[in-house]
Amino acid sequence: MLEFTESRELRLNPEITGQISESQLLIQEIQAAAKVGLSALMALWQGSIRPQRHQPEVYQTLGDVFLLAGEPLIGYDVLAEGRKYWPQNLRIRQLLALALARSGATISANLLLQELVKEQPRNEETLGLLARTHKDLWIQATATASQRLHLRLAAQYYQQAYQINQSIWTGINAATMALLQGKPSMLKPLPSRYAASVWCS
């Protein structure tokens, strides 16, 4: 589908271009560029993607790969542009909040995620991200009252997120927050393997 020339530039295989949409081709191109490195991703962002207005999945994919590459500021720029065209797209806003959190703008990320939770109170991804920002705010806090508040909220949102799909990620974090609060009784609803993972870490 995508081929590399000897100069490491990306080019599309013309045999399949008529079978899938332009946005799907770009998503495949982004995924291929991610394997090459940051320079290839930047070339896409500054070249074939930025001047055009594609489907939100293109911005989601590109923003996500920049985050995975450890470039939250560039990821933020990508996702912020995507949000201008799709202001209600949930995934773009979730990734935008993650980019903010990873960039150190924890409060801004927290406020955005609070808005998303109001819209969809039972979305595990949003609840888990909101919990993560409260965990970060707990770490950053200097006042005891603020530390207690954010630790309690982190535990609360991780518990809520876990109850939706019972995923490993939210389960381990919920168990960790329970122990940090000194409330081992909160571990009872969680599988023993999550508590064991926390005790051993």
List the predicted regions and their residue ranges.
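Amphipathic, oligomerization/interface secondary-structure segments
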Residues: Q140-R148, Q160, I164-Q166, A175-S201
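Helix-turn-helix repeat elements of alpha-solenoid scaffolds
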Residues: E29-A43, D64-D77, L100-L112, T144-A155, ...
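Canonical positions in the second alpha-helix
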Residues: G47-S48, E81-G82, E115-L116, Q160-A161
